[in-house]
Curated annotation (Swiss-Prot):
It comes from the Eukaryota. Component of the Clr4 methyltransferase complex (ClrC) composed of at least clr4, rik1, pcu4, rbx1, raf1 and raf2. The cullin pcu4, rik1, raf1, raf2 and the ring-box protein rbx1 are components of an E3 ubiquitin ligase, whose activity is essential for heterochromatin assembly. The lineage of its organism: Eukaryota, Fungi, Dikarya, Ascomycota, Taphrinomycotina. One of its GO terms (cellular component) is CLRC complex. This is Chromatin modification-related protein rik1. Its main location: nucleus. The keyword Lipid biosynthesis does not apply.
Length: 1040
């Protein structure tokens, strides 16, 4: 079975560095997933993406260095597959060039794979130091200009050396020392010491070492000034500088990263494990006298900071794996730019009974918790934009005699002609010092209602004015105008002649004039009406109903003979729809989209009329002749929208926002689009209960920046609302580990109990809960204490199955009491249960995958497979095929053959895919369109916020495999053929996983990327190389 994997890579920043990778430009180099992304950085423009460098493995280190005699920096890249290489940017060919080819610097595994690795660059650009194992490093010398010309490389092959100390906790290089001096924080098992070692590059020998600090317990060391050193302890900060030692008090915390402020001497920024930032400053007071100050910066804390980088004087980049990464102006402490990030993903939930294929993601950390709804949405592409501030409303008058755009401001209306390429030309003859409320045109004339008059223009722009006092609202349809006077009177005009008038008891809040002789009206008395009239007749009410709150917006649409659709927005994100036949109510429903009031706008195309529901969660309403349908709409945030159609018949939209106007065109193919809802607590699991979401949440209460307490809750939340209410809370020492839905009114909960001052759970509890008072609260029906923490729950036939510690047990409910029927001990911690029919699949902590069943009295093991590493997640893909995610970021396909006679031959590992990320959740996602080979069958999520899909390939496996090989070869064309072939050999699998990312990415390549790719193919632009790439794209289109 061949599978295709397509992942939406996370935006988490693994690490970052600032340099001049491109000469004369401030560059920020970000490591995100399997790419090195280069951004140009400035205070005015923020982060501007420049180029991306694909990688064949995740990055362990990336360090800039500048070879002598050059004005730009090279990048030294160390990968997690124990390979390093160096690259630089070629200004002539505008492409990445490999300076030093990939070299595997370690051929044996260290005894401690979790030991911290170090990569240090000497500021005098003499050498790069890279860890080989716990005590050994390799010194790679940076070559001089003469040596670089001879060898064609900027670095040599290096030489190894070892420290005479063990248990190294941190390491740095002193600044401006005549001989490279490495300072090591190490321990003898009882106490910690700080020792400096001088490395002689000519003799390749390491000195004996000079003890700088004894019996300290620091968390970080860093260079300070010229040949100075800072040692950070949990309560004190020690400084060695100019032969003196100074100690100051510091916060009780553990430090992680540091960066010197560029342009500032003796100024540093450090961060701790809680995500807080601190400034460390020093100033010279006199001869051998200086001061040292540390203060906490008033910047909100970050989750899991991965890097601190000073770009240039005043700018600081903070990279994060679990929250937004930000570029901050230190002078104003304001955000200049940011890179959004979901954070770790805890759960995936497919939203069933949904006409669109949509799913829900639970993600985040205590400071970045959110629900993300992924729905197929219609997308509005931005074709152009114009910066104009202060616009209240935009209105388009088509073909008079050319398209006119009227922009309403608080005290004036400015008219423009819409030219080609969406250029605007001012038309002063139609501009006025009055605010325009409504506009309509027909037969070479148009009607304009402002705050003080009704104006009718003919084709020669001659106007007839009717002055009306106290106009509060208005709507126009062709030559008719419905004008609200003094809030309560409604006057109907045909051109400049009044044909009907009626005064109401309540003030009118909104109205819509969409069809001849019919008007939809909303009142402050929380009523809506459909009014009818005819020329020279009175106004009568054809339909009337009450609404729960004040109607803010209304739209009335005729959808056939005697059939109307009435939409009323009456609250924050809530609106009600009414379908009427001969003004009798046929159907009504209430919808809730977003959290801000909905405004309605028509969007008429050749295929029919749609209603745009615009707020912070835009939607499109269609299907007026049958059941109403609602499709999410992906569009720029705006507070007003209008439509216009050009001379060729193409339909466009104009959106109004604080930044000005955007010209949009509807893309008819729906795309998977996220919508984020922020939460106060971290959602760990989601279950649907009666059209509501039941969330298992984690609340972290920060006592101060040093400590916090955690509590687990069960909360209910509406699908389109960020408001939630708590239905059950657990005690402070009890963690809610798993929730299992039994039916629409009850659920089974597994917990772990931690005693005070204990790090691991001492036991667990199984709780049966039941809803009462219409999902208002949960009550405990039954509970039982278990000997270990509950890990997983499932339903097995008419009973429940629970995994706790090393045991798996069958639990039954008898007379509202939970009782263990039978149990089995597996000898290792159980990580996951998968129940399919009578078979139970179990993944445990030592990498075993076991299948067994329960015969009514005992468990019987029928198959077992041992992986060479830990299993993090497993799922039943289809039939008897399981997909396994391992700790090293691999996906493995495991087929179960129950008919095999030999117990050890019942599992066959069919293929392997290098995902380079740890999977946190698998979720089945049924296929609806079998014609598309990339239609997902299973979704997966990862620990750094990536979401992906997997699908079986029923045909074209060999063609697609060959196609991905071609694309991959082009993708890594900056490598030599020999280096690429060694990478390709590692990716070969008997039954292939097809990399869907390659195919999708190439389909989206822009022309600039194609030309850059052509340079990569043949190192110069040529028609021949372009034809190769174009042929590849045509092949993709034919297969996909």
């Amino acid at each position: 079975m061949a599978l295709c994997v397509h992942s939406f890579w996370a935006t988490a920043v693994d690490t970052a560095t600032s340099c001049h990778f491109i000469s004369s430009e401030n560059c920020l180099v970000l490591l995100q997933a399997l790419k090195i992304n280069i951004y140009l950085c400035s205070e005015v423009h923020g982060l501007q993406f420049f180029t991306s460098i694909p990688l064949f493995s995740t990055v362990k280190h990336i360090r800039p260095y500048r070879p002598p005699g050059l004005d730009r920096d090279y990048l030294f890249v160390v990968l997690n597959d124990d390979t390093y290489f160096s690259i630089y940017w070629d200004e002539d060919y505008q492409k990445v060039i490999v300076d030093h080819p990939p070299v595997r610097y370690r051929v044996t595994f260290p005894w401690n794979r979790n030991a911290k690795s170090y990569c240090l660059v000497d500021l005098r650009m003499r050498a790069i130091f890279l860890s080989i194992d716990e005590i050994s490093m390799i010194c790679i010398r940076i070559l001089s200009a003469e040596e670089r010309l001879k060898t064609g490389r900027s670095i040599d092959s290096g030489f190894p050396f070892s420290f005479p100390v063990h248990l190294i906790y941190d390491m740095c290089i002193l600044n401006d020392s005549s001989t490279p001096t490495l300072v090591v924080l190490h321990s003898d098992g009882l106490d910690c010491y700080v020792t400096a070692f001088l490395l002689d590059l000519s003799s390749k020998s390491l000195g004996k070492g000079i003890r700088l600090f004894e019996r300290v317990k620091p968390s970080m060391i860093m260079p300070f000034g010229k040949r100075g050193l800072l040692v950070f302890e949990s309560l004190f900060i020690h400084c060695m500088y100019r032969g003196n030692f100074v100690t100051i008090n510091g916060p009780c915390t553990t430090y992680m990263h540091w960066t010197p402020l560029k342009g500032q001497k003796m100024h540093y920024i450090v961060c701790d494990t809680n995500g807080y930032l601190f400034g460390v400053y020093s100033s010279i007071l006199g001869k051998n006298k200086w001061s040292l100050v540390m203060e906490r910066l008033p910047i909100p804390p970050f989750d899991f900071i991965t890097s601190l980088n000073s770009i240039h004087e005043g700018l600081l980049f903070i990279g994060s794996k679990n929250s937004e990464s930000k570029l901050i102006n230190l002078s104003t402490l304001k955000d200049v730019d940011s890179i959004p990030n979901l954070g770790p993903i805890h759960d995936l939930l497919v939203l069933k009974n949904d006409i669109e294929k949509s799913f829900l993601v639970c993600a985040g950390t205590p400071r970045n918790a959110s629900l993300i709804y992924f729905q197929h949405a219609l997308k509005l592409d931005i074709l152009g934009q114009t910066k104009i501030s202060g616009i209240l409303r935009a209105m388009v008058l088509p073909s008079y005699p050319e398209h006119k755009l009227f922009l309403g401001f608080p005290s004036e209306t400015v008219a423009f002609n819409i030219k080609e390429d969406f250029q605007l030309e001012l038309d002063p003859s139609l501009s006025t010092k009055e605010r325009t409320i409504a506009l309509s045109g027909t037969n070479g004339e148009f009607v304009q209602v402002t705050s003080t008059f009704l104006c009718i223009y003919d084709s020669a722009k001659r106007s007839r004015l009717v002055y009306i006092e106290k106009i509060t609202n208005a709507a126009c349809y062709q030559e008719y105008s419905a004008i609200v006077i003094n809030g309560t009177a409604l006057a109907i005009f045909k051109k400049d002649t009044e044909v009907a008038r009626k005064v109401f008891e309540s003030e009118i809040s909104c109205l819509d004039f969409s069809a001849q002789f019919q008007i939809g009206v909303g009142f402050w008395s929380k009523q809506v009406m459909i009014l009818t009239f005819s020329d020279n007749s009175s106004i009568s009410c054809a339909f009337q109903t009450n609404v729960p709150s004040l109607p803010r917006n209304i739209i009335l649409e005729g959808v056939g003979v005697d059939r109307n659709l009435l939409l009323v927005s009456s609250g924050s994100g809530e609106f009600k729809s009414y379908v009427l036949f001969k003004n009798n109510l046929v159907f009504s429903e209430t919808k809730h989209f977003g959290t801000t009031p909905v405004s309605f706008r028509r969007f008429t195309m050749n295929i029919g009329t749609y209603i745009i529901c615009n707020n912070d969660c835009p939607h499109m309403v269609y299907g007026f002749n049958g059941a109403l349908c609602y499709m999410p709409l992906s569009m720029p945030q705006s507070y007003d929208v209008c439509q216009f159609r050009d001379n060729s018949g193409k339909d466009f939209l104009i959106s109004v926002s604080l930044g000005g106007l955007k010209f949009l065109q509807l893309n008819p193919l729906p795309e998977l689009t996220p919508r984020k809802v922020l939460l106060e607590h971290v959602p760990l699991q989601a279950i649907i209960f009666q059209n509501k979401l039941l969330l298992r949440t984690l609340e972290n209460r920060y006592e101060d920046y040093e400590s916090y307490k955690e509590n687990y809750h069960l909360e209910l939340v509406d699908s389109y609302d960020d408001n939630s209410f708590r239905v059950f809370s657990f005690t402070e020492n009890e963690r809610c580990e798993k929730v299992l839905k039994i039916n629409e009114s009850s659920l089974l909960v597994g917990t772990s109990i931690i005693e005070q001052d204990k790090l691991v759970p001492v036991n667990g509890r199984l709780i049966l809960l039941e809803f009462e008072k219409e999902l208002q609260s949960l009550k405990v029906v039954s509970s039982m204490v278990l000997s270990a923490a509950v890990i997983d729950l499932g339903v097995y036939n008419d009973r429940y199955i629970v995994a706790f510690g090393q045991q798996v047990a069958i639990v039954k409910l008898t007379e509202e009491r939970l009782m263990i029927d039978s149990r089995i001990s597996l000898g290792s911690i159980v990580l996951q249960l998968i129940v399919e029919g009578n078979e139970i699949a179990i993944a445990d902590s030592i990498g075993r995958f076991t299948i067994m069943y329960f015969d009514g009295q005992k468990f019987i093991v029928v198959a077992r497979y041992l992986f060479g590493e830990n299993i993090v997640k497993a799922a039943l893909y289809e039939g008897t095929v399981y997909i396994i995610a391992t700790n090293s970021g691999l996906l493995k396909l495991l087929r179960y053959n129950k008919d095999a006679k030999n117990f050890n031959d019942r599992f066959i590992c069919e293929s392997v895919y290098h995902l380079h990320d740890k999977v946190s959740k698998f979720q089945n996602f049924p296929i609806t369109n079998t014609n598309s080979f990339l239609e997902p069958k299973m979704l997966f999520a990862t620990e750094i916020g990536a979401i992906g899909s997997i699908v079986s390939l029923k045909d074209k496996e060999l063609e697609l495999e060959e196609l991905t090989r071609k694309i991959r070869k082009l993708k890594f064309s900056y490598l030599s053929s020999m280096d690429y072939e060694s990478i390709e050999a590692d990716l070969i699998s008997p039954v292939p996983f097809i990399d869907g990312d390659l195919v999708i990415d190439v389909k989206r390549w822009a022309s600039s990327e194609l030309f850059r790719l052509c340079r990569s193919v043949e190192h110069r632009e040529s028609l021949n190389s372009y034809q190769k790439v174009q042929a590849l794209l045509e092949e993709i289109q034919s297969l996909c």
